Amino acid sequence: MGRAGFVAGNWKMHGSLVRNQELLDAVVSGTRSLQNVSCVVCVPYPYIAQTQSVLEGSHVLWGGQNVSQYHHGAYTGEVSADMLADLGCRYVIVGHSERRTLFGEGNQVVAEKFRAAQERSITPILCVGETLAQRESDETEQVIAMQLDAVIDLAGIEALGQSVIAYEPVWAIGTGKTATPQQAQDVHKFIRSRIAVHSGGIAENIQILYGGSVKADNARELFTMPDIDGGLIGGASLVAAEFISICLAAQN
């Protein structure tokens, strides 16, 4: 049996109490028929409690967009994995390209956040990917290998096997350039082969998502690629009809 589908919505810094309620209600209603696909929404910290109250008992799961590498202490403004767990979060995004680029999170910090989440039974969605400059210098595989190796070195290959990976082609986000389904597949295949160096079983079973501007009109073509198991969805996750269509596309 093949890997199950997985679609995670990343709301980024968007939302309001009124809009959230409408969006979440629509997503729950519109994805009731989903089979063999996990549907997750990763929302801003202040809205996690609201999201929990709306989604609890439904088939839609929720998570955070970031987590501290520390479990408690004098870290003003940080949110720990314990706090996310208190609010029922099953997943958290770590290493998103915006965190790496805008907030200077390097591979070691990302690995520590990955480990902190797992220590509180939260599944990390580990983001990896290369910039335009790195791609044009033919460094894609080297960059992604380093991002994966940092986690494997700190937490171990078995821990990586208990996560979800998302490939973000940073070079294709907001640059006017587009990654074709085949380009995405090529990198997903490399990620799987890199993991297979440590464990063939984990490489075969781990879910790898594509995070490069997935929309309703390109989701099905992307998800038919053999090593693409779903998507990490940005802007389209804020539009109920778009997000629902993407989730349904992941069934195939």
From Swiss-Prot:
GO aspect biological process, one term: glycolytic process
Organism ancestry: Bacteria, Pseudomonadati, Pseudomonadota, Betaproteobacteria, Nitrosomonadales
Family note: Belongs to the triosephosphate isomerase family.
Single Gene Ontology MF annotation: triose-phosphate isomerase activity
HAMAP family for the chain: TIM_B (MF_00147_B)
Subunit record text: Homodimer.
CDD domains xref list: TIM (cd00311)
PANTHER family: TRIOSEPHOSPHATE ISOMERASE (PTHR21139:SF42)
Keywords: Cytoplasm, Gluconeogenesis, Glycolysis, Isomerase
Function summary: Involved in the gluconeogenesis. Catalyzes stereospecifically the conversion of dihydroxyacetone phosphate (DHAP) to D-glyceraldehyde-3-phosphate (G3P).
GO cellular component terms given for this protein: cytosol
Coiled-coil stretches noted in the UniProt entry, renumbered to this chain: none
EC number: 5.3.1.1
EC class (word): isomerase
Name of this protein: Triosephosphate isomerase
Predominant place of localization: cytoplasm
Pfam families, per the entry: TIM
InterPro entries: Aldolase_TIM, TIM_sf, TrioseP_Isoase_bac/euk, Triosephosphate_isomerase, Triosephosphate_isomerase_AS
